[in-house]
């Protein structure tokens, strides 16, 4: 097996008590093995009791001792100090590497105490064997056998072997198919360095096919960084990626609910989000389908239910109501999209009636959305996905007879700006766009409360840029038609740009 040489540098020491006993400064319980027994005496700790109860020992400081003394040494082959019986195998390990795992360290110390009537003398022999003065002497400490029982089904022999290999080598490659098993092994071993590395790799490798397993692992091991990473990734990619891939059906309902409630959720429009959610429900009920269905197939499926009861009022749909209550149906204003809502037989009649009433009042009052107050939870959302090939990108949107262009510009490799501006209906690229919305507002000014957000992923972390929540009157002249501009610097691609706004009473 392998073993590293001892580091020559000595840790700084400080005298403890009236005798020649010492500890490391600023450490309540030193991990320097040469002073471990003396430390217990100086701090009035029953050393043999502490040895029999390894939880009292500060394993992290013992780990620090080995790290400081062995980190710059080449690993050599040598006789193993410990035999680990686990998963039907016997694994040969060495003390300096073993102490990186809190679980193995505690098992080792417990076995050391149980295997002799003089545990203090036994440990002192071990400490002398680790002394820099004894590097050429063979360790007098006997081989100790420890056992570890693992019941976690995620832990495979290959994954566990990879985890143990990481005790000796810091940059062992972890295959994607073994990643969950290595994470589980690191959790059981209490090998914090490897566990964190697995979490970082998982966050970097999030995609529609992996998010379910990674999110469930984060929940299982109570790893908030991983679950939060999954939530943030899905907030940006639910509509752009999830809505186009068969893996959408794997997304757990609780994760989906969190994402739908988030003000960071990116969508091209409220109707795009609705279509994504209808597809998710369709895939839950038709889980044997192997290819993404067409939009027409999904619509036909829901229209096939008897008209006497909408889908969300049926037993099969009631549990999904919390998800669809998160949707902003009031933000669906295009005539043909409203027709889809009405004839889909998916939503309760009371929901659709409220949408109709809100639209009627807004149209009667020149677009004023008097029923909307909070920009974070009620605003109408539109989005741009700015990719590598884009130098300029824009979309025209319409709301209650007002037309806006949302636009993004790339100035150089890392500089971008985003804004929106009001345009005249006569400036639309196609006259059919006017007829599509059925009406045009002739008001000279429109008060708008809005916010522009942009997010990009850089080195596994999300960069977020945003304007303040701004109230502004948009006119039709050059000086009054343009919003504030969001200017950003980022190397991340793609950039997810969200425009959220409300028409307050004016």
From Swiss-Prot:
It comes from the Eukaryota. Pfam families: BTB_BTBDG, BTBD16_C. CDD domains: BACK_BTBD16, BTB_POZ_BTBD16. InterPro entries: BTB_BTBDG (IPR056426), BTBD16 (IPR042833), BTBD16_C (IPR048859), SKP1/BTB/POZ_sf (IPR011333). Residues 150-206 form the BTB domain. SUPFAM superfamilies: POZ domain. This is BTB/POZ domain-containing protein 16. It comes from Homo sapiens (Human). The lineage of its organism: Eukaryota, Metazoa, Chordata, Craniata, Vertebrata.
